[in-house]
């Protein structure tokens, strides 16, 4: 699968976004267990979509032959060297790591797990574009401080 470029605010990957990066020289994702999940893309400045590539844009690519395509957010674009830039992107899940959550608590009930997850979303300092769900039905209390 060729990598596809999307605008920073895209939430669906079911189209070709800003365009397919057919001119990409290489595109490799690296996932370390309990560690980083990053993508490195090399692209020529003469490529059809070079002008569209910007910080915070999303690149959707297959991390390997078996997994589904995954979105990665661009955080670094190198200066051109011999007409080629190196683009670094982190998996979109890293967007959550910079979003602080205000304190809240959930009392024990049959919906405590889902209520706690919704509390994380509604009490986030910045708007959270992610949705949360679980099939865990454990009855327990939760407190975020």
Regions found by a protein language model. Give the residues of each.
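Assembly/oligomerization scaffold segments
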Residues: 1-107
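Charged- and aromatic-enriched interaction segments used to assemble
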Residues: 84, 90-145
């Amino acid at each position: 699968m060729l990598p596809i470029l999307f605008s920073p605010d895209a939430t669906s990957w079911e189209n070709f976004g800003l365009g397919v990066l057919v001119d990409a020289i290489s595109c490799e994702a690296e996932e370390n267990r309990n560690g980083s999940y990053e993508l490195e893309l090399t692209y020529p400045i003469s490529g059809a979509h070079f002008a569209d590539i910007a910080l915070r844009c999303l690149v959707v690519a297959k991390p390997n032959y078996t997994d589904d395509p995954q979105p990665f957010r661009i955080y670094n674009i190198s200066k051109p060297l011999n007409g080629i830039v190196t683009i670094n992107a982190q998996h979109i899940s890293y967007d959550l790591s910079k979003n602080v959550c205000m304190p809240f608590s959930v009392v024990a009930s049959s919906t405590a797990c889902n209520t706690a997850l919704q509390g994380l979303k509604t009490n986030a300092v910045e708007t959270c574009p992610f949705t949360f769900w679980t099939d865990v039905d454990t009855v327990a209390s939760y407190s975020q401080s």
